[in-house]
Amino acid sequence: MNIWENRLFLKLMRLVLGVWFRFRAINEEAAKCEGPALLIPNHLSWIDWLFVGLCVDRDWMFAASEMPARTSKLHAWVLSNPRIILIGTDPASALKKMTVHLEAGGKLILFAEGRMSRTGCLQRLFGGTGFLIHKTNPKVITCYLRGAGRVLGSVHGGWTKWF
């Protein structure tokens, strides 16, 4: 089941996140563009993909690590979504898929840091990001998730909260 195809589910999820995390999005229109486009958000928690995914159209694809799918059935189910390009132990093949997608005028969401931030600051981006930008010349959109480091799914050592 592809949850991203169900508009009612997406509206309900947005309402739940609005109540639970006080989620709100500012300037969502920036992501409503023609491809090729590369959306680069900061990465603070395990549910950042959900916050970002609710703000973009269905034609955006995600790039995600396949490692969590090896240990958890929940992660395997989430990562089985056809909108996800999995990055495995050989990142070159995933980078090729991302390049082909962008060259075809596609849109891609890439957590370019490659790992979650423990400080809340943007970390060094992986070299593959520069390669994608140089090779495909996409419109680059940056996205800042403010406060996402305080949700329970974050990895930093500070305080977290439910609501």
Residue spans for each PLM region:
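A cross-family acyltransferase "interaction/gating" segment
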Residues: 27, 121-163
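Cofactor-binding loop segments of dinucleotide-utilizing enzymes, especially the Rossmann-like FAD-
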Residues: 42, 65, 113, 145-146
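Hydrophobic/aromatic ligand-binding patch that stacks against planar heteroaromatic rings
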Residues: 51-52, 78, 100, 131-135
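Helix-to-loop junction immediately C-terminal to a conserved catalytic motif
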Residues: 6, 11-43
